[in-house]
Swiss-Prot record:
<keyword id="KW-0391">Immunity</keyword>
<dbReference type="GO" id="GO:0005524">
    <property type="term" value="F:ATP binding"/>
</dbReference>
<feature type="region of interest" description="Interaction with dsRNA">
    <location>
        <begin position="201"/>
        <end position="211"/>
    </location>
</feature>
<dbReference type="GO" id="GO:0032728">
    <property type="term" value="P:positive regulation of interferon-beta production"/>
</dbReference>
<keyword id="KW-0479">Metal-binding</keyword>
<comment type="similarity">
    <text>Belongs to the 2-5A synthase family.</text>
</comment>
<dbReference type="GO" id="GO:0045071">
    <property type="term" value="P:negative regulation of viral genome replication"/>
</dbReference>
<keyword id="KW-0547">Nucleotide-binding</keyword>
<dbReference type="GO" id="GO:0046872">
    <property type="term" value="F:metal ion binding"/>
</dbReference>
<keyword id="KW-0539">Nucleus</keyword>
<protein>
    <recommendedName>
        <fullName>2'-5'-oligoadenylate synthase 1A</fullName>
        <ecNumber>2.7.7.84</ecNumber>
    </recommendedName>
</protein>
<dbReference type="GO" id="GO:0060337">
    <property type="term" value="P:type I interferon-mediated signaling pathway"/>
</dbReference>
<keyword id="KW-0067">ATP-binding</keyword>
<dbReference type="GO" id="GO:0042593">
    <property type="term" value="P:glucose homeostasis"/>
</dbReference>
<feature type="binding site">
    <location>
        <position position="149"/>
    </location>
    <ligand>
        <name>Mg(2+)</name>
    </ligand>
</feature>
<dbReference type="GO" id="GO:0005739">
    <property type="term" value="C:mitochondrion"/>
</dbReference>
<dbReference type="InterPro" id="IPR018952">
    <property type="entry name" value="2-5-oligoAdlate_synth_1_dom2/C"/>
</dbReference>
Amino acid sequence: MEQELRSTPSWKLDKFIEVYLLPNTSFRDDVKSAINVLCDFLKERCFRDTVHPVRVSKVVKGGSSGKGTTLKGKSDADLVVFLNNFTSFEDQLNRRGEFIKEIKKQLYEVQREKHFRVKFEVQSSWWPNPRALSFKLSAPHLQQEVEFDVLPAYDVLGHVSLYSNPDPKIYTILISECISLGKDGEFSTCFTELQRNFLKQRPTKLKSLIRLVKHWYQLCKEKLGKPLPPQYALELLTVYAWERGNGITEFNTAQGFRTILELVTKYQQLRIYWTKYYDFQHPDVSKYLHRQLRKSRPVILDPADPTGNVAGGNQEGWRRLASEARLWLQYPCFMNRGGSPVSSWEVPVDEAWSCILL
């Protein structure tokens, strides 16, 4: 697949995305069907017979399925199970293992029922207190297996709508607990709906560009192995490049792709954040944000969780990815018809320290 992408002419990248990366309708329906089966199981029967009452307040689809950026053939989904039993972030950290254990037990038990035709293949975890339960789901009506990560989470946000922002007090509590526990970014799952909403309303073509960048990242991962920066960092970098460099619904895909790879090569200068869900207005949040933004670069703060620097702590991974990006910038997918390089968007690598409402 690497050969196909790098040798694709720049003016045919949209076609490449359409043919190789966009999931077809039947595939999407399969994944949706599998998710519905699992959501019903988690909400209605998983905790039905537990000794102590367990209340699932909601099950939220996260990851690429939730954001609408799934790649063709990549049938995976994150399901975040919000439990009213958790009373704090620390409580989630300490008790998530017991709920994962219960979900695992119920998956095994339901398989014994003859009328239940869905099969679960649970992946073993060696961690004593795992963040997620990973398994594969298969069923007669599905064309292929679907991989799931189920993550128990504290329902700190309650009801979330597209147009309302969290109370700043939620972030002050988050920051306080993360500092006392030394667990920055540990509770990002609690903000899954905000992460999803941040991307969900974006233009279709931007989501296609995200798919292209994710595909490129997967090719790099196959070639380079670990360590690499997290894929989410590349997704956010793509959104940032589009917002600051173009921002229109229709754009040149090759120019956008080139811009993102150039930003990867400048990783040591990156300092990126958004003020959509949190900002500098609350003194405690402002103090913490300034501290985060003074950290060694690259810094890319999760737009939903200020404690999560999704680009941090992996200089070697960025160095290796940047080296690969420099190679790719010489390939035909970044050349015009006459052989000259495709131009890139003008994008600052360092976001100004001001309250930017996007």
